[in-house]
Amino acid sequence: MLKIMRAKRLLPLTVALIASLAPLATQARRALTPEDWYRFLAVSDLQMSADGAAVAYLVTSYDKSTDESRAALWSADWAGGAGHQGVPLTQGESVSAPRFSPDGRSISFLSAQPSGSDTQLWLIDRHGGEPRQLTHLNGEVSGYEWSPDGAHIVLVMHGVKDSQVEGKPGKVGKASKVRKAEAAAKPLVLDAYQFKEDEEGYLTVASRPHLYLLDVRSGAVEPLTADPERADSHPQFSPDGRQVAYVSHKPGGGAEDAGIDEIWLVAPAAGAKPRRLLKTWTPNHQHLAWSPDGKSIAFLIGDEPKFNAYILDDLAVAEVATGHVRDLTGKLDRAVVSPAFTSDGRAIEFAIEDDGFQYPAQVVLATGAITHLGDSMVVSELATAAGHTAVLATSDASAIEVNALEAGKLRPLSAHNRALLDEIDLATVENFVFTSRDGTEIHGQIVKPPDFVQGHRYPTILWIPGGPNGQDQHELVLEGYGPPLERQLFATHGYVVLAVNYRGSSGRGATFARTIFADWGHKEVEDLLAGVDYAIMRGIADPGRLAIGGWSYGGILTDYAIASDTRFRAAISGAGSGNQLTTYGTDEYIVEYNAELGPPWRNPSLWTQVSYPFFHADRIRTPTLFLGGDKDFNVPIAGGEQMYQALRTLGIPTQLIVYPGEYHVLTRPSFLIDRFRRYLAWMEQYLGRSP
């Protein structure tokens, strides 16, 4: 399973690459290769200066020599364009969380420099220069927010072991290494209901973040929140600087507290008493935004906790004085992301996830009227200031880039991947609609090889998106589990790829998503197989050369499908599981399991039912490649290990690939490329190539 994840990772663009942005007008285009991953650059964390004159963002890439990823800070002028490429402001150690200072002259960011030290806060001139370290603290800074006057910064910190928060310049790296070594040598004491999280590991009391107030001029730091039972994050200053709103929850509480977020307010002063504003429920990352007049706060709100795994976040506003909440987008029946107030405070802009797209929209507070700000696009992040709106946008043929959104149209402000994409003959992507076995209308996309010939039947791969609360979109996403890149890789090597948004997916409303509640592996499989039948009926797919695969819930559904149908000649199950009993208490979804399936000792037959790929492994005939990271707490690799062992025992061709030190999303460059190579080799071994 996989929570919606929209933030992307990838390293600095060099001067040589900037110089190579001219289109390759005469050079023949070629197929995408696994090695191209080293040249892709991912753009993320978009920020806009208060005057709307500039944007800041991260550009992440992979370094072949060190086998690591690094994110660099970039800045671009609003008045520029793709022909006026932005400029890199940092190099060397990776950075995160860029933010403009209130006066717009500087950009702050987080970084662990030197490597291995605690993450601290840094500042650099907006136009470049040497960065300056703002904090030298005995703990990790994981987030922060400037006060409107620039005099203070609220820090989100964890791992603070003693009462003396402030450290000494030049000593942080050594102290950090000692503390980390000590932590690794001691037993971990756990008391949280959900006690583990992918990439974070085991959730101890020391890992719970709290808020601290930094005086920018003096460097003094004082605690704002300190309840050991709570975890505090996402601080946002009110426009007048008198209050800080933040998100808090109780990981040390019982089952009744699990998954509950609360929005609190506190004055930015040592000893101030926090006030709880409201409770909310959303399984995805919370996002707070103050109205310009400081009277209300926009945030994301879920529906019934019972449907935690299928929640489509609504946009809501809460009155600061009373806590009264108004849901602004409930009637849309679609998930929203990245809300931001317009400069005049009359409206909120956001992005809507809808049937293969994610487009920008606006809701007028006075009337509740919702209008589209653009169609047929995929927008992952949105920033607005001084009447300007910038977005991170992607399409089937374009990786995520920074764009100005003007009158419903995109104006490029970056083109980090243009040189590479100009070399590649990308596959075409077409929408298709078909009917599942019970008459339900299902939507998806067919990805055809660049040299596709109508009337020829092609080896066809059903590549399944993760989730289930997610969807295949018209995008070229460059992330560790990104189906859009994988389907391009397969298609440019001669395969037709089917992307089916099965029941359980988001993008078509709550009822469509909740159809599979407590009934995994049935309606989704019917939808997937019906998509294959449709492609065969259309004369596109070769019925004798079919394959299936996916990562996360895509891997789980692969296990379900090959245990239900023997037509597939090859399968790839990445970060999947065929025995859900194995995952109870070993992954991070205890809240979802108990809400949806109940504990196994209460509903053993239901748990056995949703684990049928393992208990009926003797039905499987498909050669299957299993893969996963050995540190994955999202879908632990035990799920793949058990299925591998079952097929190995049954004599079905199979292989297990374990990536050491990797979580649910692979990040080590050589491992990513290894995975892509294995994908292609497995398909070629059992399907062959184009017709």
Which sequence ranges carry the predicted segments?
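Bacterial N-terminal signal peptides
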Residues: 12-22
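Conserved beta-propeller blade repeats
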Residues: 40-55, 92-110, 130-131, 138-154, ...
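Structural motif
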Residues: 66-72, 117-120, 164-167, 208-210, ...
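Predominantly five- to eight-bladed beta-propeller fold
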Residues: 70-72, 158-214, 257-262, 312-314, ...
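Short loop/turn segments that connect beta-strands within beta-propeller blades
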Residues: 77-81, 125-129, 215-219, 267-271, ...
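N-terminal cap/lid segment of alpha/beta-hydrolase-fold proteins
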Residues: 415-455
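Short beta-strand element of the alpha/beta-hydrolase
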Residues: 456-466
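Active-site-proximal cap/loop segments of hydrolase catalytic domains
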Residues: 477, 483-493, 498-691
